[in-house]
């Protein structure tokens, strides 16, 4: 019989939505020759910040 392991809920990621501009937005990013530019037109639903709607693309 294999030993039991315990998983703690506080380890790793917590469930929930994180603010996009606080976790993924990198304003000082410098483009590279291998980057691909893609443009999307996004209209957020009422009450949704534009950067959050853009993050969903």
UniProtKB/Swiss-Prot annotation:
It comes from the Eukaryota. It catalyses: 2 (2R)-3-phosphoglycerate + 2 H(+) = D-ribulose 1,5-bisphosphate + CO2 + H2O; D-ribulose 1,5-bisphosphate + O2 = 2-phosphoglycolate + (2R)-3-phosphoglycerate + 2 H(+). Its EC number is 4.1.1.39. It is found in: Plastid, Chloroplast. The modification N6,N6,N6-trimethyllysine is found at residue 14. SUPFAM superfamilies: RuBisCO, large subunit, small (N-terminal) domain (SSF54966). Its main location: plastid. One of its GO terms (molecular function) is monooxygenase activity. The keyword Acyltransferase does not apply. GO terms for cellular component: chloroplast. Residues 1-2 form a propeptide. GO terms for biological process: photorespiration; reductive pentose-phosphate cycle. The modification N-acetylproline is found at residue 3. Keywords: Acetylation, Calvin cycle, Carbon dioxide fixation, Chloroplast, Lyase, Methylation, Monooxygenase, Oxidoreductase, Photorespiration, Photosynthesis, Plastid. The basic functional RuBisCO is composed of a large chain homodimer in a 'head-to-tail' conformation. In form I RuBisCO this homodimer is arranged in a barrel-like tetramer with the small subunits forming a tetrameric 'cap' on each end of the 'barrel'. RuBisCO catalyzes two reactions: the carboxylation of D-ribulose 1,5-bisphosphate, the primary event in carbon dioxide fixation, as well as the oxidative fragmentation of the pentose substrate in the photorespiration process. Both reactions occur simultaneously and in competition at the same active site. Belongs to the RuBisCO large chain family. Type I subfamily. Heterohexadecamer of 8 large chains and 8 small chains. This is Ribulose bisphosphate carboxylase large chain. The lineage of its organism: Eukaryota, Viridiplantae, Streptophyta, Embryophyta, Tracheophyta.
């Amino acid at each position: 019989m294999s030993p039991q392991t315990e998983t703690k809920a506080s380890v790793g990621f917590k469930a929930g939505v994180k603010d996009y501009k606080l976790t993924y937005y990198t304003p000082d990013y410098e483009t590279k020759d291998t980057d691909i530019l893609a443009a999307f037109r996004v209209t957020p639903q009422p009450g949704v910040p534009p950067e959050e709607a853009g993050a969903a693309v």
